[in-house]
Every structure is written in C-alpha cells, then in structure tokens.
Regions:
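Glycine-rich phosphate-binding loop of ATP-dependent small-molecule kinases
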Residues: 1-253
Length: 253
C-alpha cells in the first residue's frame, strides 16, 4: 500500500498529535515555498496526472477539512489549476440532502470516490460527521439512526468506520492524502472582518460562521481526536499552517 510522504506537518500515527502544539504559521520564513515553488509543483502534478490516467490502476483522493475562512476553496483552485480537468473532480459537501439521510453516513462520499486513473477532491467530507455533528449532537436526531444513540461511543464507532474504509480503499489502489488547514482564531476573525469591509468579499460572509466561533474549543477537541484516530501511513493527515495563504498552498502542492 501507499505510505505517507514525510513532512514536518505530518500528523503522527501513534495518537500523540496535539492541536495546541500545531503551528498556524510557517515553520520557516516561507519565502522558498511561495510563487515559483508552488508553480513548479503544479506543473509536476499535471505531468503525474497523465501518468496516473495512463496506468489506470490507482486513483488519488485528496480530503480538505478546516474551520471557516481557512482557505479550502482557494487552495484547491490554486494547487489544481494546471491539472487536466478531465482527470480531476471536486466535490463540496454541505448539509446532507433527504436522499443522503436515507443512507448511512459514509454513503454520500462513497458514491463520489474517484475512479482508477483520476484525482478526486473532497472539500469537506465524511469527517463532518465526527466534527460538526459532534459539536452539535442534536443533528443526530435527524439522521434516522436505529435504536438509542449512545453519545459515549458513537464518535469512536464512526471514526473506526472511516478508518476501516480508508484502509480498504488503500488496499485497492486509492492513494489518500488528507489536509487540515489550520487557521488561528485571530486570523479567522481578521478574514471574517475583511468579508464585511471589502465589497467584493461580501458574498462570502455568512452570519452562522460567526456563531460557530463560539464553539471553537469544541471543534479543536473534535479535530484532535479525529486526526489522531485516522492518521495512518496509508491515509495520512497533514496539519498545514493556514495563517499565511501562499505558504499554505505551496505546502499542499
């Protein structure tokens, strides 16, 4: 199976990752990792995507998770801009539809897994079920789950299901790379304010995003447990500093 490329931002596989110890700013001055560095990596990605398509034995799944305003959309656009669109597909997962709620929590992402020879990108993912839903457990009331819900065990059970599915995919040729774009609370606030102050960014502002800031510590706890439970050599997590967007995009590339 595929094994994780080494990186200073690789979440360890032994469950010792700490959100508090994860940097939101570059570990270097960032200069070597901007501009030319990202463009060179993007060119390499384009070439490698053609090799992937020609081989038709493997697929690549890129998963992006982050707090609001971390830069998921812009990072995906920036990193993948040189890749042949016919070999790449992006799916953004919002609130589940009624059809999706008629299935298990992994169904909607399973249906969108990339075929052999293609790159699939999840902008948010099945991990919402152990992040947003964990912070707001009342959502479980609308998920049509059988029997009584045990909040003491359901999150570990869901993380186990995700972990097992990822191992199954890896054994069958899917290369999985997961990125947590780690933005600080102060930088998130600055970006929210810029969405109000700058007319061309007004459309990005959502009042609910501000409400979610009240649950920041709960989210950090949920992220810490999720990353520790599911970072494995065949499906690694990378905690990428997100306060400096150009650096973040370069590191993802």
């Amino acid at each position: 199976m595929f094994e994780a490329p080494d990186s200073p931002y690789l979440v360890p596989f032994d469950g010792t990752f700490s959100v508090a110890g994860a940097s939101t700013t570059p570990l270097t001055d960032g200069k070597p990792h901007k501009g030319k560095f990202r463009r060179k990596r993007t060119e390499e990605l384009n070439k490698l995507q053609r090799v992937l398509a020609a081989g038709d034995k493997h697929s690549i799944l890129l998963v992006f998770q982050a707090m609001d305003a971390a830069g998921k959309d812009s990072t995906i656009r920036s990193v993948m801009q040189g890749v042949d669109p016919s070999g790449c597909q992006v799916f953004s997962f919002k609130k589940p539809s009624s059809l999706e709620l008629d299935h298990d929590f992994l169904w909607r992402t399973t249906c969108r897994l990339p075929e052999r020879g293609r790159i699939g990108i999840f902008n948010r993912s099945q991990y919402e079920e152990v992040l947003v839903v964990r912070v707001h457990p009342k959502i479980l009331d609308y998920q049509k789950l059988p029997g009584d819900i045990d909040l003491a065990s359901i999150w570990d059970e869901r993380l186990s299901s995700i972990r097992q599915q990822e191992e199954h995919l890896a054994r069958n040729g899917t290369v999985i790379l997961k990125f947590w774009l780690n933005v600080s609370k102060d930088e998130q606030k600055r970006r929210f304010l810029s969405r109000l102050d700058e007319v061309d960014k007004n459309w990005k502002f959502e009042p609910n995003d501000v409400k979610e800031r009240r649950h920041w510590d709960d989210y950090m706890g949920a992220y810490e447990q999720a990353l520790n439970a599911t970072s494995r050599p065949w499906a690694p997590w990378y905690a990428i500093p997100a306060d400096d967007k150009p650096y973040m995009r370069a590191r993802v590339a």
